[in-house]
Each structure stands twice: as C-alpha cells, then as structure tokens.
Design a protein with these regions (language model features):
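A polyanion-binding, active-site-adjacent surface
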Residues: 2-254
C-alpha cells in the first residue's frame, strides 16, 4: 500500500497524529509473508469457543497472579483488550496510572494517539488485540524489573499462542527489548522486520505513543514504521496460504 492509496479515514488519522503525508520513494516490493507451515494454525483466529474459554482462563490467572511484588501495589491487573480474530497484536511496556484504574491498556492521551496510529494502517482499536509486557503497574511508573518481566512473560507468550497474529507491533524500547530478548537501541530496531518464536511471527518496532506526545518531531519516523506495518499486512493478505516459505519483508529506511 502506498500513500496514494490511503483512504480518507487514514489521511484524517495521520492529521490527528500530526504527520504530513508525502509520496514514498520507489522501493523494491515486499516479498511474501506467510505463516510458517510447520506450525499448526492456532484456533484463536477461528473465533472458536475453545479459544475464547482458554483466553478467559488465562485472564483469570492474570487477575489473581501474586508471583511478584507488583500485586501488592496494583489496583487491578490489566490483561489486555481486543478480539480473538485480531491479525495485529500491539504490545506495550506496562500499565500506567489510568490503565491501573480502568483495567484496560492504552487509555488516556497515549491511548488516543495509539488509536490514530491504528486508524492510519486501516485498523480500529476493536479490530486488534492490545497487551503489555507487564500486566501490573510498576509504582511511580518506574521501568519494569527483570524479575517482574520473568514472571509476566509467560502470560504474554500464552496470549500470542492463542491469537497467532499475522503481525506484532511493539511500541517502545522496553517492550521491544523484553519481547525480542535484545538490548539494541530502539533506533536500530526500527525500519526492519524481526520475527518472534518458532512460528516466526513478523514484528515491527516503533516509538511508544507517550514518547511521541513528548517528542512530536519523531512522528514522521513513526509514520515510516506504520508504512512498514502496511507492507507486511499487505503482503500477508495477498499471499497467505500459498506456500510455506519463511516470511521475509524488505527493510525500510528508518
């Protein structure tokens, strides 16, 4: 998908983000993106009752988890929000104060900007699934500690296994480092496609909406990341199921 084919709704979303749309330089088209044929297709995208029951059971475990000290200071755990049929999974760092109160990830101003970012790639909040590395808010919004991440990551991995999304969009340095198991600077993680797990789910890294609110000049770079998101989704939608080759997508200039 190029800028010339953006819908009116997507242009409006970009205006809300404060991003000017320009014509992209010609580039080599994306190659095929397919699910790894060696990995059984999870039931999450079928919308089956079994998957819904499994997600409810997982949410119950999250809500009652006392594996780390964060359960003592939380108002509630924040499991995640979205549909089992989501082709896009958005992963952030941890709940903030608003999320801790409301029990839903990405609310407030950062959530509003995330909604506009989703609209820019042709998705509504209701069409995706949104989760965090940590399910409980760290006090004073401090960075997650390694022992907290260690206890929480199995929940996120279980969510990914249930959903089997076509694409994971990771927002922010901490989320990217913990999901991908790297310490590479965020700027070097952007502009290319990473892969998660044995099923090699494509992963695109971009800035956290809260950071973009503080640094609006970086929104143009975030738009480049969203173009890469659209490339991956477009390739997946046009070639899904045609072969079992490993997914590969061209890198984009960050």
């Amino acid at each position: 998908m190029t800028e010339g084919f953006l819908s009116v709704r997507q242009h409006l979303a970009l205006q809300e983000m404060g991003v000017d749309v320009w014509v992209r330089r010609p580039h080599e088209p994306a190659t095929r993106v397919t699910r790894d044929s060696r990995v059984p297709h999870a039931e999450g995208n079928s919308g089956s009752a079994n998957s819904a029951d499994a997600l409810l059971a997982l949410n119950k475990q999250i809500l009652t988890c006392t594996a780390c000290e964060l359960h003592k200071t939380r108002t509630q755990a924040v499991c995640g929000v979205g549909t089992l049929s989501a082709d896009v999974l958005v992963i952030g760092e941890a709940p903030g104060a608003d999320e801790d109160k409301q029990g839903e990830p990405f609310v407030g101003r950062a959530g509003q900007l995330l909604n506009e970012m989703l609209r820019a790639v042709g998705r509504s909040r209701e069409q995706v699934f949104i989760a965090n590395i940590l399910k409980c808010r760290p006090p004073q919004n401090r960075d997650p500690r390694s022992e907290e991440v260690e206890q929480c990551l199995p929940f996120l991995r279980a969510q990914i296994e249930l959903l089997q999304p076509r694409l994971i969009v990771v927002v922010g340095r901490i989320a990217a480092h913990n999901l991908l198991g790297v310490e590479t600077p965020l700027g070097q993680l952007r502009g290319r496609v990473h892969y998660f797990g044995d099923s090699r789910i494509p992963v695109v890294v971009t800035y956290h909406p809260a950071y973009l609110l503080r640094s609006p000049a970086q929104k143009s770079k975030s738009w480049q990341d969203l173009l890469l998101v659209m490339d991956v989704l477009s390739a997946a939608n046009t070639t899904d199921g045609q072969d079992g080759r490993d997914p590969k997508v061209h890198e984009r200039q960050a």
